[in-house]
Amino acid sequence: MRRNHTRTYTNRRYLDAVEDHIVIFDGAMGTSIQRYNLTADDFGGEQYNGCNDYLCITRPDVIEAIHTSFLDVGSEVVETNTFRGNRLTLAEYGLGGRVLEINRAAAQIARRACDQAEARTGIPRFVAGSIGPSGKLPSGSDPDLSNITFDELADVFYEQAQGLVEGGADLLLIETSQDILEVKAAVVGINRYFADAGVRIPLQVQVTLDTTGRMLFGTDIASALATLEALPIDVIGMNCSTGPEYMRAPIEYLVENSVLPISVLPNAGLPINVDGEAVYPMEPDPFSEMVAEFARKGVNIVGGCCGTTPEHLAQLYRKVHGHPFNALLSSSQSDAQSTHFVRRRPRPRQPQREARVSSGMTATLMAQNPGPTMIGERVNSQGSRKVKQLLLAEDYDSIVQIAVEQVQAGAHMLDVCVALTERDDERQQMEALVKKLAQAVDAPLIFDTTEPEVAEAALALYPGRGIVNGNNLENGRERIDRVLPIVKKYGAAVLSMTIDEEGMAHTRQKKYEIARRIHDIAVNEYGLSPEDLIFDTLTFPLTTGQEELRGDAVETIEGIRLIKENLPGVLTCLCLLYTSPSPRDS
């Protein structure tokens, strides 16, 4: 799938390195801290004991020494000691008001270590601002863990990004992500900070999969890729959770399908319990061999997570690049600089470029092969008397059952409309239904509404990549200029009808001209990709008997042909209701 993300960076040195050669990250910060056997006094007192992030204030020497230990064995990128450095997790230690201070200090420590290593060897080093989970799970149903809004989460990550960038980070790393909806909020919050601050550095996102290949709420790697690739990020990957042996299948999928660079930072195997402590048993040699294999298959960035030590990374450098990094340290600076040209280049990839949407569990091709893509329309208050009555009764569970039955009958996506003339709480009903549907059906959802704020409310709750339906030019640009920013913000796709100020288009040329207007606004002004756009060319029922509409079906078919020929990449759809005299509920 081709993305239309044209970005100007204030610092893109890291991406330059990724394009040039396989980049090696560091290993485990937590494991390294444990080796120091620190006491409560090192953490600043008993109340802060165990808050690793606070060591950036109380023991910056320890954190800098850990960074240096990885830089000395060939790591080009070190992660800041800020994995739990957001206001929600720091608040557990009474440090929620010191987010900027802690993150800024952490980035400055890593920056100092990287600059010194670069001065010693002549090899560029990079600071990755580590951003871990918030501790909330917005996709879930737990009343405590899910009790946070999308915008509140975005604010949490905005603040942490600010501290890291101000401290000198070269890139930001959202890592160990278990809830894809939280990741979306983090990406939105970070990009809002970039816009407000007038800066842009690369954004790398890494999800965590269990041994079955899924995130905490069942999201597989295909869904994660479809959801995240539509957002303004620069690298996608995986880290933590399992050792490298369980990452093979997801990595193969990313290599075959991701247009973005790929990162893989596994644990040193699955943890085992030894005397009440988690121990990661994988030794440096087998770990480095398996991870180097990923690099040979097309992964761009490798490193380690829990349990990985400088020994693991030294071996990884040697197996990826074919020589030990220590040899560089004994060379002159000019010799070290020359090794830049012998580092292994990334294996060229030719990913499949197919537009996808996703539920919170899996991805769906927007253009099925063989076609057509079937959109179920029974979860629709405007098209189903039964659903209308269920909405009036607020019987959402029965509506979910209808949705499940439509998916079982072959629907690839579901159109969801809850608008009722009898009620004025469309937003609240959409939110209630989307929350239940997201957990019950694996078909992606289409949010069918004339109200942009209702569409945004749905997207803010939806863990996958959805579609917004109801876009048109009926009132000129009034609607489109409200809808497209929302589509862009959440990485959604958009379904637009060929309606303009003069009404519904009847001729092939008029249908195409309206589609062209919408296409040009969406692509050239809002930065959407053609693959994000679906056009419903509309037609009247073939059985109207009205003479002036006799040729409507032919004009619709030819309008589709014109759109396909002249707007490469866009998709089209048509409601089968209008080609059949059957009742709407059939």
Where are these regions (language model features)?
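Terminal amphipathic helices with adjacent charged low-complexity linkers/tails
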Residues: T308-M361
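Conserved small/polar residues in nucleotide/adenosyl-binding loops
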Residues: Y578-D585
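Alpha/beta enzyme core
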Residues: P143-L171, Q178-L203, F217-L260, S288-E293, ...
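Conserved, mostly hydrophobic/aromatic
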Residues: G27, F70, A110, L172, ...
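Hydrophobic faces of well-ordered beta-strands that scaffold small-molecule active sites
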Residues: I24-D26, V78-T80, V127-G129, I174, ...
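Alpha-helix-loop-beta-strand connector modules within alpha/beta enzyme cores
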Residues: L95-E118, K184-V205, L254-P266, L316-F325, ...
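N-terminal small/glycine-rich loop or linker at the start of catalytic domains
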Residues: A17-T58, F83-L90, T121-E152, I201, ...
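Glycine-rich, proline-tolerant flexible connector loops at the mouths of alpha/beta enzymes
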Residues: G50-T58, L71, V77-V99, A169-A185, ...
